[in-house]
């Protein structure tokens, strides 16, 4: 699965001599690509290297599922006259040049048949450039249609000027009757430019007066946001500071609230991809105006007071918690109002959920007399009216991006389930942790086929976690295709029931068979419209977020283990060093005691003959080395003193072969006892000297 960030960007030149020049390109990191175009980094484009520097980024379009789709968008934007998507509508822009031409092409391209089904996001960096270019394109189109002023008077370029003037007079009269004054179009010179100093106010007035271009208004599949380079980098390009990743302060330590689930709740606050604080606030805001009154007939049943329809309509969607998109309902429609005014949860609302979304304060039980359906809640009445919900209405020759009228929307407004009324941040984090635990153990079934789900291959509803729809990607595609076929059969007016279609001969399999839904479909559980492009985009976004969350958790665990290891090593080093020094002093003291017990007095020669042993010819002919006592050299006491000194030079001097020879000559014989004790003392002194030096270095490193 390709989870990279694909975008197509638009650059314009800041050079006064190249005003209006633009460049269109594709990149996975547009800010780095901008630095390459400006010469700060290598591998820039040839067109931007000759002239036009410095360049600035005006806007970019993201949300493409893969690089092929993004490259198609780039090629269509660069070659609109040769593109099959725009060749029939680009004729209206003939004669328009420079940046206004690129912006006008963008207005048409986002509504093309291929790209209007994708969940795209328009990131605007320089709104002034974009608005001015769009206004100039509007003025150009108004001039092409004959409604422009040259020298203060109207001039017709087509035989329909009379009809246009009549329509202008009618519109002006209608505006005066409605109390709205329609401002006139600004005057143009013979070159098609504005007379005098073109101000942003005049261009904005012209744009507001007549929308000849399809506007870039936010919709369900087109999101528009004004951002800066820093915010854009933090949100989409930085892996460590990505706004898709919940912040460290957002994490909830669930183990403090529930000790029984400490094995899975220790990291639930940092592993939840949702903003748990936003979810809890949305649930409280949804049920803040709802009050319960006890019923005199049944004290176990609580009646919901009249609910304000506009109470929770301004809560943002959890899938776009970090963006400036238009607010959306955190909807859910699995709880139906019965005839007696009691809200009861349908059995289908717990499909694929189980204990993952179980509230601590469970909703009140329904009355015994209240009817309860035994199957999933029926889909809204308008499931077959998908054409009226989101049909691509033509805008001239351009396909509009799924406009929907309020009358076509479902009558009942989706709501948050009652069990989430008392949910807090800890509850949402624990529910997500339990759901992930069931998912990785194969215990979470699909909501459509009931087969176990696998990680990273399931689709959630756009209102998750308030909607419990969890299903395979292929199952949802089949559901949406079946809904499209049913809607097409209803629109045609022919009787094409599933029973009749089952007896029909199977259609031949062809590579041109469409397997990807093109029309939105209501959710089987909550009734919210689901768009295929939006679902795929959210799936990839969730995969990226989960990977980054796992990486963050792994880094946190490694740091914790490293700190614990260091904390265990520090006292161990200190205690080990002290014990080694004590053992060293004990060895030196024992060697000195043995030497004194053998009768060796410092500064005096040995007069008692020691037991001798005859050596062979080789030993007899070997060179003899004088005893250190005969030359007045320091004895074992000096070795002990050298062992206590950390200086390596003194230790080496004490262990030199000329001054510390363990063999003494007495009447042609060797004193083996003295040699043995002296060798042991020399070894102890050598070990003591090196250990002293090592301990000194360790303490030096361990100093604060």
UniProtKB/Swiss-Prot annotation:
Region feature Disordered, mapped onto this chain: 157-180, 290-323, 354-378, 601-629, 650-671
Biased composition range(s): Low complexity: 650-662
BP GO terms, sorted: DNA recombination; DNA repair
Function: Catalytic subunit of a heterodimeric structure-specific endonuclease that resolves DNA secondary structures generated during DNA repair and recombination. Has endonuclease activity towards branched DNA substrates, introducing single-strand cuts in duplex DNA close to junctions with ss-DNA.
One Pfam family matching this protein: GIY-YIG
Zinc finger (SLX1-type) residue numbers: 446-526
Family matches, as PANTHER family: STRUCTURE-SPECIFIC ENDONUCLEASE SUBUNIT SLX1
Stretches assigned to the GIY-YIG domain: 4-90
GO terms for cellular component: Slx1-Slx4 complex
Keywords noted in UniProt: DNA damage, DNA recombination, DNA repair, Endonuclease, Hydrolase, Metal-binding, Nuclease, Nucleus, Zinc, Zinc-finger
Matches recorded under InterPro entries: GIY-YIG_endonuc, GIY-YIG_endonuc_sf, Slx1, SLX1_endonuclease, Znf_RING/FYVE/PHD
Ranges annotated as biased composition (Polar residues): 161-175, 311-320
Gene3D superfamilies found in the cross-reference section: GIY-YIG endonuclease, Zinc/RING finger domain, C3HC4 (zinc finger)
Metal-binding is among the record's keywords: yes
Subunit structure: Forms a heterodimer with a member of the SLX4 family.
GO MF: 5'-flap endonuclease activity; zinc ion binding
Family to which this protein belongs: Belongs to the SLX1 family.
Chief location category: nucleus
Top EC category: hydrolase
Record-given protein name: Structure-specific endonuclease subunit SLX1 homolog
Organism whose genome encodes this protein: Leishmania major
EC number: 3.1.-.-
């Amino acid at each position: 699965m390709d989870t990279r960030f694909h975008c197509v960007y638009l650059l314009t030149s800041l050079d006064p001599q190249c005003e209006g020049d633009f460049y269109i390109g594709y990149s996975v990191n547009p800010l780095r690509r901008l630095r390459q175009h400006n010469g700060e980094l290598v591998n820039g484009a040839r067109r931007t290297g000759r002239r036009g520097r410095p360049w600035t980024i005006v806007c970019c379009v993201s949300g493409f599922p893969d690089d092929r789709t993004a490259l198609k968008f780039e090629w269509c934007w660069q070659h609109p006259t040769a593109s099959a998507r725009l060749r029939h509508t680009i004729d209206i822009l003939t004669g328009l040049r420079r940046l206004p031409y690129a912006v006008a092409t963008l207005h048409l391209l986002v509504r093309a048949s291929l790209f209007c089904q994708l969940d795209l996001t328009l990131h605007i960096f320089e709104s002034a450039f974009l608005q001015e270019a769009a206004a100039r394109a509007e003025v150009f189109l108004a001039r092409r249609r004959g409604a422009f002023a040259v020298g203060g008077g109207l001039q017709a370029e087509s035989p329909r000027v009379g009809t246009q003037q009549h329509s202008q007079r009618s519109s002006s009269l209608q505006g005066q009757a409605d109390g709205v004054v329609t401002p006139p179009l600004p005057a143009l010179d013979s070159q098609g430019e504005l007379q005098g100093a073109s101000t942003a106010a005049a261009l904005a007035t012209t744009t507001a007066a007549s929308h000849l271009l399809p506007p870039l208004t936010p919709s369900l599949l087109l999101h528009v946001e004004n951002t800066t380079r820093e915010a854009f980098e933090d949100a989409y390009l930085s892996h460590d500071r990505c706004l898709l990743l919940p912040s460290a302060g957002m994490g909830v330590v669930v183990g403090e609230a529930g000790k029984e689930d400490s094995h899975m709740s220790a990291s639930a606050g940092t592993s939840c991809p949702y903003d748990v604080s936003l979810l809890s606030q949305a649930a409280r805001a949804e049920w803040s105006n709802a009050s319960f009154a006890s019923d005199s007939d049944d004290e176990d049943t609580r009646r919901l007071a009249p609910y304000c329809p506009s109470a929770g309509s301004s809560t943002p969607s959890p899938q776009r918690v970090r963006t400036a998109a238009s607010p959306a309902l955190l909807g859910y429609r699995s709880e139906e109002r019965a005839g007696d005014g009691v809200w009861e949860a349908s059995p289908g609302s717990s499909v694929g959920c189980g204990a993952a979304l179980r509230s601590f304060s469970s909703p009140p039980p329904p009355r015994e007399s209240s009817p309860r359906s035994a199957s999933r809640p029926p889909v809204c009445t308008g499931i077959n009216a998908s054409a009226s919900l989101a049909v691509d209405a033509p805008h001239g020759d351009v396909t509009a991006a799924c406009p929907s009228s309020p009358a076509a929307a479902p009558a009942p407004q989706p709501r948050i389930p009652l069990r989430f009324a008392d949910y807090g941040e800890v509850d949402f984090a624990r529910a997500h942790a339990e759901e992930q635990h069931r998912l990785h153990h194969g215990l979470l079934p699909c909501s459509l086929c009931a087969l176990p789900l696998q990680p990273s291959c399931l689709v959630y509803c756009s209102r998750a976690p308030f909607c419990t729809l969890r299903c395979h990607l292929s199952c949802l595609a089949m559901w949406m295709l079946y809904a499209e076929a049913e809607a097409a059969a209803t629109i045609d007016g022919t009787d094409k029931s599933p029973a009749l279609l089952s007896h029909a001969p199977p259609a031949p399999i062809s590579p041109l068979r469409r397997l990807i839904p093109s029309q939105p479909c209501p959710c089987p559980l909550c009734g919210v419209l689901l768009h295929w492009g939006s679902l795929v985009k959210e799936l990839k976004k969730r995969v990226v977020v989960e990977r980054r969350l796992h990486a963050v958790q792994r880094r946190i665990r490694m740091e914790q283990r490293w700190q614990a290891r260091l904390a265990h090593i520090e006292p161990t080093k200190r205690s080990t060093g002290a014990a080694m020094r004590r053992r060293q002093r004990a060895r030196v003291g024992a060697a000195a005691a043995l030497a004194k017990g053998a009768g060796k007095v410092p500064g005096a020669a040995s007069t008692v003959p020691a037991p001798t042993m005859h050596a062979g010819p080789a030993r007899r002919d070997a060179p003899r080395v004088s005893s250190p006592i005969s030359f007045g050299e320091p004895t074992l006491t000096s070795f002990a003193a050298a062992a206590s000194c950390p200086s390596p030079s003194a230790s080496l001097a004490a262990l030199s072969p000329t001054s510390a020879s363990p063999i003494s000559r007495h009447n042609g014989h060797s004193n083996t006892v003295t040699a043995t004790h002296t060798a042991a003392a020399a070894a102890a002194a050598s070990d003591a000297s090196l250990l002293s030096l090592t301990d000194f270095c360790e303490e030096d490193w361990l100093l604060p």
